[in-house]
């Protein structure tokens, strides 16, 4: 019996699951809206909500805990400088999940997970990985 076990396994090892949620939470912080499968979105929401709660309390300890979770310094900086102050007065419920139909290839239920009161201009700015020299030149 599986009573009392929280979360889904997604046919992945623990390390793979943790890395997947770290990457997905970094992508959500970066773009403030991502499209994924519905079960992944449902399991991603508590991870991101805890990160936003960390972002509301700007301390060295909270920054280290966030860095251990998402492993991207730029996204940690955005978490504490943009998202934390934005949701300072909101006691919880920072994300919303909207169903988005079914994927064509395997009919998997899809969902859009986004921040409540998100910045609509944050979406679509990613052009892939860039080198440090081109980022400093711009």
UniProtKB/Swiss-Prot annotation:
InterPro entries in alphabetical order: Ribosomal_bL17, Ribosomal_bL17_sf
GO molecular function per UniProt: structural constituent of ribosome
GO biological process terms, semicolon-separated: translation
Protein's UniProt keywords contain Aminoacyl-tRNA synthetase: no
Gene3D superfamilies xrefs: Ribosomal protein L17
GO cellular component: cytosolic large ribosomal subunit
Assembly notes: Part of the 50S ribosomal subunit. Contacts protein L32.
Family: Belongs to the bacterial ribosomal protein bL17 family.
Database matches in PANTHER family: LARGE RIBOSOMAL SUBUNIT PROTEIN BL17M, RIBOSOMAL PROTEIN L17
Protein name, UniProt field: Large ribosomal subunit protein bL17
Record organism: Methylorubrum extorquens (strain CM4 / NCIMB 13688)
